[in-house]
Amino acid sequence: MRLPRGVGDAAELRKSLKPLLEKRRRARINESLSQLKGLVLPLLGAETSRYSKLEKADILEMTVRFLREQPASVCSTEAPGSLDSYLEGYRACLARLARVLPACSVLEPAVSARLLEHLRQRTVSGGPPSLTPASASAPAPSPPVPPPSSLGLWRPW
């Protein structure tokens, strides 16, 4: 029993494309490893000319070693700067808000002034705001309950 012509053609096409796809895959891997070598060797302080013919496993091992050494140095130097960066951004945002908010007609001037004062107090306390929701510290005001109507419910029938 023979397969239909379309099924056989598809199988032949797959067989003929398989070596080509494998060649492309290997080329992508080799290109990525070459780029990785070019990125990692200078960071390790190694001369690229001295390591011109590294095996793929060597490139991967050097990369793993470099990445394992990375977290300790990144975390220790970045923490103080990130708080300064946060505060700098917060102050810049507050300054922009102080220019724009008074011209905003949506808020009453008293509310606008209270909001700006609250935000300025946050810069004095320093640091980012806590991640606890505001509803945990103060209960939200409940909406006013309308008085019961003496007319009863309106029904369309």
From Swiss-Prot:
Residues 86-119 form the Orange domain. The keyword Hydrolase does not apply. Disulfide bonds: none annotated. Its main location: nucleus. The keyword DNA-binding applies. Transcriptional repressor of genes that require a bHLH protein for their transcription. It holds the Pfam family Hairy_orange. GO terms for molecular function: DNA-binding transcription repressor activity, RNA polymerase II-specific; double-stranded DNA binding; protein dimerization activity; RNA polymerase II cis-regulatory region sequence-specific DNA binding; sequence-specific double-stranded DNA binding. It comes from Rattus norvegicus. This is Transcription factor HES-2. One of its GO terms (biological process) is negative regulation of transcription by RNA polymerase II. SUPFAM superfamilies: HLH, helix-loop-helix DNA-binding domain (SSF47459), Orange domain-like (SSF158457).
